[in-house]
Amino acid sequence: MMHICHIEIDTQGLPAPTPEIEQERKVAIFDLLEENTFTLPHEDAPSGPYRLSLAIREKRLVFDIDTEDGAEAAEFHLSLAPFRQTVKDYWQICEAYFDAVKKLPPSQIEAIDMARRGIHNEGARLLQERLEGKAEIDTDTARRLFTLICVLHFGA
């Protein structure tokens, strides 16, 4: 089956996350491992499941992919530049959401959450575009990976 069976986030050199960011990371990893679709499209690529390591190195997002038994499957680097504005917008709306949960009525929280989901969907769409030809992922997998990119980008 073509999916991610293990994920590691390389936070070496990044500041410690806030409790909210750590919670976002934990939820995204849990949800991702519960259900995801991840395929390496080139015909000579080993089949999954895959172990994925995400890192930021030299201002680039690094996907390091191994097979379940540890054999190298692929590695590719994506520029962070196309993600910067969407990540920034996502964290701004997340801050508003975290504040709203503490003091606003449910109707206002729902409005902020809808905006947050919209930005999240945009980030997922952008990630799917950037991965074209490198990896094929479904929308839910893209959303969860985008969350992890945001977590990494926050500290970078």
Swiss-Prot record:
This is UPF0262 protein Jann_2882. Belongs to the UPF0262 family. Pfam families: UPF0262. InterPro entries: UCP032146.
